[in-house]
Amino acid sequence: MSPKTETKASVGFKAGVKDYRLTYYTPEYQTKDTDILAAFRVTPQPGVPPEEAGAAVAAESSTGTWTTVWTDGLTSLDRYKGRCYDIEPVAGEESQFIAFVAYPLDLFEEGSVTNLFTSIVGNVFGFKALRALRLEDLRIPPAYSKTFQGPPHGIQVERDKLNKYGRPLLGCTIKPKLGLSAKNYGRAVYECLRGGLDFTKDDENVNSQPFMRWRDRFVFCAEAIYKAQAETGEIKGHYLNATAGTCEEMMKRAVFARELGVPIVMHDYLTGGFTANTSLAHYCRDNGLLLHIHRAMHAVIDRQKNHGMHFRVLAKALRMSGGDHIHGGTVVGKLEGEREITLGFVDLLRDDFIEKDRSRGIYFTQDWVSMPGVLPVASGGIHVWHMPALTEIFGDDSVLQFGGGTLGHPWGNAPGAVANRVALEACVQARNEGRDLAREGNEVIREASKWSPELAAACEIWKEIKFEFEAVDTI
């Protein structure tokens, strides 16, 4: 390099390290309608000012790095950088802050949850200047959400396919989750569907193990579906889990399900990955299959209050990536879920337009425009005594799924399904007549059990079962 070139290269470039807040903390910034907005719960290391911590998050999740680089001069950082535009303390927590960050739309590939998350929840979560970091919420602008297909079909199309209206749908996860042969598994599916359930489900652990290979399970479950449909006159389904070790194998299983003529398949979207999930969702729309989503592994990501990512973000990501159902907690069962927080992300799954409501953990107003909605699935430790509360909490556009609460019935699988269907129909009728399920729910169940021996037996066996632990996920 000549002396002349060296002199020219040094002009306008000052090497070294400077505070992130000098570039990435911009409290005067006015957010744009096209910006992706994020709310991070930030716990800085001792001695790190909140403005520096928030700016570091904005920098490390967009254009910044630990030192000034000369190639910054080859682009417009003001156009592409993330900006921490507001910081507020978290009430009741020492040294925790909510940092609001705005990202320009051009930072992200269209239609890719994978790329979105690689930036926003990528390496920044291991940044040493932060003791902990949690992504509480995202605002997805219509300019970005319209680049996604979203759910394969959505709530209304599913109801039309099933010809079922005016009530929640009923499901059951086949138990034991592992160890049954394909034929015995299919028998349990048939008995539950014949008894009155709309769906049965593969457990998320069920893929293609030595005791039951996937193709055998698919065939016996399809036989069970058609037999139950013929006997009941209702459309039935079983969530055939297409999750596999490779995308190619996953698609092969989905294709076989379509060839069998079944209405719905299933995917574990977090363990399977967003790229695989989006590919499957596109296939399902093109081929008329509904897509049930299980959230296995979510608690590894969202259970800790100060680090990770809240489930409402994972729920938004799923709506964009694609799924017609997703598990979302029960409020009343054995799994984590505080009522207002749960209903907040349930609305984010189902509704077209959701107003900002910090009391429910919703940090931003979200407009999904025309993207179809997703049915929330309540599953985990629920039984007939929970039916009034579930009907009142989740409303008609939901799936209520009773695994042990069906298969644990003392008289067998079909009577367990009958008990749940009777309880649901009684609760829906009582609600439609103007009765208060929150106050009169137990009485509604007792009245129905007088003419349904199956329900009476279920009420007796589960009358003492409760899961009374305080929720971790609170505001």
UniProtKB/Swiss-Prot annotation:
Residues with the N6,N6,N6-trimethyllysine modification: 14
Top-level EC class: lyase
GO biological process: photorespiration; reductive pentose-phosphate cycle
EC number(s) recorded for this UniProt protein: 4.1.1.39
Residues at the active site: 175, 294
InterPro entries linked to this entry: RuBisCO, RuBisCo_large_chain_AS, RuBisCO_lsu_C, RuBisCO_lsu_C_sf, RuBisCO_lsu_fd_N, RuBisCO_lsu_N_sf, RuBisCO_lsuI
Residues with N-acetylproline modification: 3
Signal peptide positions (record): none
Keywords: Acetylation, Calvin cycle, Carbon dioxide fixation, Chloroplast, Disulfide bond, Lyase, Magnesium, Metal-binding, Methylation, Monooxygenase, Oxidoreductase, Photorespiration, Photosynthesis, Plastid
PROSITE patterns: RUBISCO_LARGE (PS00157)
Single GO molecular function: magnesium ion binding
Propeptide residues per the UniProt entry: 1-2
Coiled coil feature spans: none
PTM comment text: The disulfide bond which can form in the large chain dimeric partners within the hexadecamer appears to be associated with oxidative stress and protein turnover.
Residues annotated for substrate binding in this entry: 123, 173, 177, 295, 327, 379
N6-carboxylysine modification, residue list: 201
The protein's role, per its UniProt record: RuBisCO catalyzes two reactions: the carboxylation of D-ribulose 1,5-bisphosphate, the primary event in carbon dioxide fixation, as well as the oxidative fragmentation of the pentose substrate in the photorespiration process. Both reactions occur simultaneously and in competition at the same active site.
Subunit structure and binding partners: Heterohexadecamer of 8 large chains and 8 small chains; disulfide-linked. The disulfide link is formed within the large subunit homodimers.
Other notes: The basic functional RuBisCO is composed of a large chain homodimer in a 'head-to-tail' conformation. In form I RuBisCO this homodimer is arranged in a barrel-like tetramer with the small subunits forming a tetrameric 'cap' on each end of the 'barrel'.
Protein name listed in UniProt: Ribulose bisphosphate carboxylase large chain
Organism: Picea abies (Norway spruce)
Recorded name of the encoding gene: rbcL
